[in-house]
Design a protein with these regions (language model features):
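N-terminal helix-turn-helix
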Residues: 1-57, 221-226
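Short clusters of small/polar residues that mark proteolytic maturation junctions
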Residues: 4, 90-92, 170, 195-196
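Conserved GNAT-family N-acetyltransferase fold
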Residues: 26, 182, 194
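Amphipathic alpha-helical effector-binding/dimerization core
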Residues: 38-134
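Short, basic/aromatic recognition patches
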Residues: 60-67, 132-182, 226
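Juxtadomain coupling helices with adjacent low-complexity linkers
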Residues: 157, 173-176, 190-237
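Sensor-regulatory modules in signal-transduction proteins
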Residues: 184-187
């Protein structure tokens, strides 16, 4: 509300009333993750400017709530933003097992997280190669894997074979955390990832996959089915 008020020059009360009206009409919704206002798929009737991350977030939100009741651990929907995966929707706020709350909008490194490695594994070759080349040119330690093509290729091949990506204490910023992630696709093209985040000391990657991978894959397929039902297609650049 504050951002829109500042951008538009309207009073905050006016902005809130307008948003509430749009919510009543079904064009915006309140995110359960952070109480922000988000566009709904109904804006298709008004404009073609509804980006892929909006589609996947709007369609996935109710499914994530159901998934939380099943797996208990928090899950995120992420999409690519140039050089990182960005959390678009999450259940961290509602999971009793999460130490994180403000996750929407957080950037996750491609080479150090399950979501990032999953996206790279299932992305088109040309798109993946361009991004890896960009990351390899950066001197920071977090991009070292991009400068080790054989090692990276082996990790991505294993990810494709297993059907999921993994991170077990790989991200120094979140050393106590582990995660697994599966791709969400449209027209056989990855457009986002669904991950499950947990405390690494609670179980191994293999245990997490055995226990929770079927649920993640099922929900990913449900998101894809909803996108197809709504005739939401990822547009090739």
């Amino acid at each position: 509300v504050g951002t829109l008020a500042e951008f538009s020059g309207l009073h905050r009360t006016t902005v809130r009333r307008l948003l509430e009206t749009l919510q009543d009409e079904g064009y915006v919704r309140r995110s359960r993750s952070d109480d922000s206002f988000r566009l709904t798929i109904n804006v298709r009737q008004l404009s073609d400017g509804f980006r892929d991350e909006h589609w996947i977030s709007a369609l996935a939100t109710p499914l994530l709530g159901e998934l939380l009741r099943e797996v208990q651990w928090p899950t995120d929907i992420t999409t690519l933003d140039v050089d990182a995966m960005v959390v678009r929707e999450t259940t961290h706020r509602f999971s009793r097992l999460s130490f994180h709350r403000a996750m929407v909008g957080r950037r996750l490194p491609l080479l150090l997280t399950a979501s990032g490695l999953t996206w790279l594994a299932f992305a088109p070759d040309a798109e993946r190669d361009a991004i890896v080349s960009m990351l390899a040119a950066r001197p920071e330690a977090e991009y070292q894997l991009a400068r080790e093509p054989e090692r990276l290729a082996a990790i991505l091949a294993r990810t494709r074979q297993n059907g999921y990506g993994e991170n077990f204490r790989s991200w120094r910023q979140e050393e106590k955390i582990a995660s697994i992630a599966v791709p969400v696709c449209s027209q056989q093209r990855v457009i986002g990832c669904l991950n499950l985040v947990y405390i690494a000391s609670a179980m191994t990657i293999e245990q997490a996959a055995q226990k929770h991978l079927p649920a993640l894959q099922r929900v990913a397929r449900q998101i894809e089915a909803r996108m197809e039902e709504e005739e939401v297609w990822y547009e090739m650049p």
